[in-house]
Amino acid sequence: ENIDPKLKYENAIKLLWSNKLDEALEELIMLKKIKPQDLMPNIQYWLGEVHYAKKDFNQAILEFGEGLKNYPDSIKGPDNMLKLGLSFSNLNNKNDACNVFIELELKYPDASKDVIQRSIKERNKLDCPKE
């Protein structure tokens, strides 16, 4: 079936927002196989988001980690890193969570205010060491 990847991507996001997580996941996995270059960083990020929403934090860590490894300079870089830290935090893995939040602020000083503020809030909540 020859469907525009952008439409498929938009549909996957709509499914995610409608809390149809399994369907969203299927769409994103299918899209990832097609590898539309311009969409790959976003597809990878949203794969992490679906697993995060399903509270499958181990899988979310793998997806956000892959996004960071493959697309560190994409617009989703800081979001990947924030959600990676939150995933570790949800698994009560304070050390890794703290390291990710600290690294986020060093690696992405120009990240959106929301991302930076959330990272700082999480670091304070976890009582992370200062450096």
Predicted regions and their residues:
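Short solvent-exposed coil/turn linkers within tandem alpha-helical repeat scaffolds
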Residues: 33-39, 70-76, 106-117
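Acidic, proline-/serine-/threonine-rich low-complexity intrinsically disordered segments
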Residues: 1-14, 18
